[in-house]
Amino acid sequence: MIANVVRNCFPVAAQVVADKADEINKLNVFPVPDGDTGTNMSLTLGTVVKEIEALPQGASMDDIAKAITHGSLMGARGNSGVITSQILRGVAEGLASSKGAQATTADIASALRNGVKVAFKAVRKPVEGTILTVLRDVSTKADQMERAKATPQETLDAIVVEAYESVARTPDLLPVLRENGVVDSGAFGLATFIEAFVNAYNGKAGEVSDFRTTVDSEGAKAQVAGVVDIEINEDWEGSEFRYCTEFLFHADSPDFDESANLKYLSSMGDCELLVGSNPDYKIHVHTNRPDRVLRHMLHRGQIFNVFVHNMDLEAQERTESIREDKQAASGPRKPLGFVAVAAGSGQADILRSLGVDVIVSGGQTM
């Protein structure tokens, strides 16, 4: 059954993204280089896993879709996390509308089309060369496979290949990626999740490709090869807006105007997102006046789980961390070095402060 596939494969794919969170974080240069894309995607997926695992055995795909929608909305962190939540919602709702016990190629294509519809609706100003581009490209590939009367297995395999090829094209679409010599972090995170999910379905749980996540200034594309050192441009002038502000919102009125309030958020900053359905929403915006944003929304309902962080400071910390790693790599050879496996950026920072020479991103599967 489709429900069993999602229930069994989703946690495995989420764990792979968690294991690669630090690697994804290092690629994070857009929209601001605050180094948290992998962490935010992992936290969002992790909340969904908890919701799915809380369901009774034999839960339907409709039940699982509701759990994915609710879990991803409640747990969404950061710009990447909120967009990921909408991708998951759209695809899950699409799968829930499938009629048969097994997903057909048409079901897969339809679910991805719905994912594109929901995710792009949530973002006022979609940017090419990001996670949304990869989503659209794999959806287009699924449509092509449906027209070619491909089997579901052939379609899934083709989607994985297209996901990484789309990631490899991101530096050609978004100049800041080319300038920094990397692919888009969110795009790579989504491709990783897709491959990990398909591999779990194919009986290869926890396996993903080695993907070269760097590009050179002459235009050589990223490719499936071996992950090499990431050369990050440390010079960043800063964003016009300093504070990443996000919170959950419960509207007081059934007439809450989503469009008008999204327009207000846009007037206060950028990367504005207002997702969900009345009365419960997730709100995200980069702004210089989080106080005004919160006050505005308090007049329209209740707010909770407020999270405000200074992106300038995060970018500085990320730059310093990269600089320290470079200095350690280029320094004189030591008679004895320490290598540690860290399950996440928080542990990596602690180990680095203790003098560990090399940090390897990993988790429970290592």
Enumerate the language-model features and the residues they cover.
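N-terminal loops that bind phosphate or other acidic moieties
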Residues: M1-M366
